[in-house]
């Protein structure tokens, strides 16, 4: 600019300060070096905002704040989705179907029967330790029917002791492990059994019971 040639430096500084607005200097000057804090006033604000409201000094701070708000909103959305997913999935685990099995005893070997009852008890204990629910049923018929005879006087001493042990095992399974014990009435009639212990339920036909239980999803496990 020819009109400024030969002018001293203070003239240029004076000319510069009179031509640029104050906000330009404040934006160019490092904020940390300013001896006071301030906010800029944006006279161009329109819409629902009132003209002349203060805006943030640093545009980067405004962008950072907007980014943080967006991240916070996304985080809240993810948390809500996770809670909704747990709300849908948790009942599946809480109300999962129990493991169901029907153990069918038709053998007459008392030692073998006692051994299998011990295994049923062990199986129930392991399932409880694993936090799994179960529903067990024992059906008794054919040669096995004598183990539910309440009149033990008819049996020899050695056989009576074994039957007493088996009945004790059945009672424990019923009372402590919620295992249902069902005796076939047809087999009872053939064995001339008139009375059974109180923990034993009689059914008209154990085969019908087996069929019904298997149709309900019970696994068939023979002794």
UniProtKB/Swiss-Prot annotation:
<protein>
    <recommendedName>
        <fullName>Uncharacterized protein aq_2020</fullName>
    </recommendedName>
</protein>
<dbReference type="Pfam" id="PF02635">
    <property type="entry name" value="DsrE"/>
</dbReference>
<dbReference type="InterPro" id="IPR027396">
    <property type="entry name" value="DsrEFH-like"/>
</dbReference>
<dbReference type="InterPro" id="IPR003787">
    <property type="entry name" value="Sulphur_relay_DsrE/F-like"/>
</dbReference>
